[in-house]
């Protein structure tokens, strides 16, 4: 079962955060806890073709091009 965040939601988030998204920022959209997002990112459970990410402390950086090219984010 996949969870999709549509590009308009992501675009709005990116405009607010200038490409740097905290796990806390994206957690409400994904319906997940920030801690779970960080854990999954660190364990590299996400498909690299869908979302590239870098985890640094409690911040997760998502690359704008990947979000918008795919039309959203798929878990």
Identify what each model region corresponds to:
Residues 1-12, 58:
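Short, Lys/Arg-enriched anionic-surface-contact patches
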Residues 5, 52, 60, 74-75:
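Polar low-complexity intrinsically disordered regions enriched in Ser/Thr and small residues
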Residues 9, 19-20, 48, 53, ...:
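Short linear motifs in intrinsically disordered/low-complexity regions
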Residues 9-40:
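Polyanion-binding surface elements
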Residues 18, 31, 45, 71-72:
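Short, flexible coil/linker elements and helix-boundary hinge sites characteristic
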Residues 21, 62-63:
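A broad, structural micro-motif
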Residues 29-61:
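Major-groove DNA-recognition helix of helix-turn-helix-type DNA-binding domains
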Residues 64-75:
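A short, Lys/Arg-enriched interface patch at domain edges and termini
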């Amino acid at each position: 079962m996949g969870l999709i965040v549509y590009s308009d939601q992501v675009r709005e988030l990116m405009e607010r955060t200038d490409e740097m998204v905290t796990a806390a920022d994206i957690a409400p959209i994904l319906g997940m806890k920030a801690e779970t997002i960080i854990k999954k990112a660190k364990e590299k459970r996400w498909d690299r073709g869908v979302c590239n990410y870098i985890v640094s402390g409690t911040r997760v950086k998502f690359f704008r091009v990947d979000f918008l090219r795919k039309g959203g984010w798929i878990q």
